[in-house]
């Protein structure tokens, strides 16, 4: 949750700071959040616990008296989603809700996939994903009912999708009926993510990558089913006869494929920028995704992207900077890897301008001003 005052000079100023980290107010500990997540799994609503932390957060909002409250990533079990939204509506505080996932308009699913229940009513849910499953029965319908009741008649709420894909789904959902939905793509720091050929060459040497061998990178915070790590392994196996070296970054999972090296967690954005620059292609094997940041970062570093055409992934691949292939089609992905050409400098420059975080900030500032005349 980001709490800002309105700026009159073209920038944003936060009126609350802590000594540990500027612009940040911690309302609960990681241990508290994990405990609340466990409570939800036992028998409660998804994101419907955290009473103490929510009271503390609402107290900070009362203290700061913001012109706008901007909500992002509320599924971390650090606040009661329903109580916070109801408070902001009742207090008539202009509120921006950015959609990084679908749970704000479903019965709790981060990604509804092929389910269309959210279009009419989330009821009789059989998906029982990690967000909605609990020991005492599925509470997806109760979650959807609460959200729909809160959104109804909320005329000071603006919903923003990071991608056109999620914005279309949100606008079509019955829970958000009548709420304006716009699109502001995420941005990245192009002062960090830029082509680094010299550092990339040194990294390739340190990994004993032979000259002329193409490097295929997979990057994800966790090697999960949703991120498609199993499909990435299938891809690496199918390319065993080709002059390709596969790298996987972000998780400590080890595998014994001879053409695959797992790098574990990469500490620091600069190190990631070097890794992107060292790769010839970034592959995105996600089964579901909204607007993956790794695609923006790789493009800004001059590395083309090959990903499955799911969610907002095609929107992150600009002309000349990669290809989106049919979902789950590892064979199509392998064929593209063998023929994809390096991007032209003009295409990289276009990506850097398009994904610059300053563009995103200006778009949000314009929205804040429209909401606070």
Regions found by a protein language model. Name each.
Residues 160, 210-227, 233-236:
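Conserved donor-binding/catalytic core segment of Leloir-type glycosyltransferases
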Residues 304-307:
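Short hydrophobic beta-strand element within catalytic cores of glycosyltransferases
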Residues 165, 187:
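Carbohydrate-associated surface elements
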Residues 342-372:
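A charged, aromatic-enriched C-terminal amphipathic alpha-helix characteristic of glycosyltransferases
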Residues 274-279:
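Short alpha-helical donor nucleotide-sugar binding micro-motif in glycosyltransferases
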Residues 1-4, 8-16:
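Short, small-residue-biased leader/transition segments that mark boundaries at the very start
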Residues 287:
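Aromatic "clamp/platform" in nucleotide-sugar-dependent glycosyltransferases that forms part
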Residues 319-330, 338-342:
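Conserved acidic donor-binding segment of nucleotide-sugar-dependent glycosyltransferases
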């Amino acid at each position: 949750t980001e709490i800002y005052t309105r700026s009159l000079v073209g920038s944003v100023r936060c009126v609350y700071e802590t000594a540990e980290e500027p612009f940040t107010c911690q309302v609960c500990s990681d241990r508290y959040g994990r405990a609340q997540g466990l409570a939800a799994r036992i028998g409660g609503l998804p994101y419907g616990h955290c009473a103490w932390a929510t009271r503390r957060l609402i107290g900070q909002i009362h203290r700061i008296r913001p012109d706008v409250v901007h909500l992002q990533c509320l599924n971390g079990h650090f606040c009661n989603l329903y109580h916070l939204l109801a408070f902001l509506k009742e207090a008539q505080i202009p509120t921006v809700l950015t959609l990084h996932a679908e749970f704000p308009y479903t019965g709790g699913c981060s990604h509804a996939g092929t389910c269309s229940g959210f279009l009419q009513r989330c009821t009789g849910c059989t998906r029982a994903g990690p967000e909605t499953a609990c020991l005492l029965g599925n509470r997806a319908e109760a979650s959807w009912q609460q959200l729909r009741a809160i959104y109804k008649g909320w005329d000071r709420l603006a919903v923003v999708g990071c991608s056109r894909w999620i914005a279309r789904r949100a606008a079509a959902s019955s829970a958000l009926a009548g709420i304006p939905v716009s699109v502001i793509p995420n941005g990245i720091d192009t002062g960090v993510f830029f082509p680094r050929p010299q550092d990339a060459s040194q990294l390739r040497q340190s990994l004993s990558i032979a000259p002329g061998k193409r490097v295929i990178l997979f990057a994800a915070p966790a090697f999960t089913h949703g991120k498609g790590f199993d499909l990435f392994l299938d891809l690496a196996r199918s390319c065993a006869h080709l002059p390709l070296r596969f790298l996987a970054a972000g998780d400590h999972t080890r595998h014994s494929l001879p053409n695959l090296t797992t790098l574990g967690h990469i500490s620091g954005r600069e190190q990631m920028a070097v890794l992107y620059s060292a790769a010839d292609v970034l592959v995105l094997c996600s089964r579901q995704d909204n607007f993956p940041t790794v695609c923006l970062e790789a493009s800004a570093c001059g590395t083309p992207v090959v990903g499955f055409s799911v969610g907002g992934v095609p929107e992150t691949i600009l002309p000349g900077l990669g290809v989106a292939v049919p979902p789950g089609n590892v064979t199509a992905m392998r064929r593209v890897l063998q023929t994809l050409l390096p991007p032209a400098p003009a295409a990289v420059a276009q990506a850097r301008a398009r994904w610059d975080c300053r563009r995103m900030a200006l778009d949000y500032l314009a929205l804040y001003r429209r909401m606070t005349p």
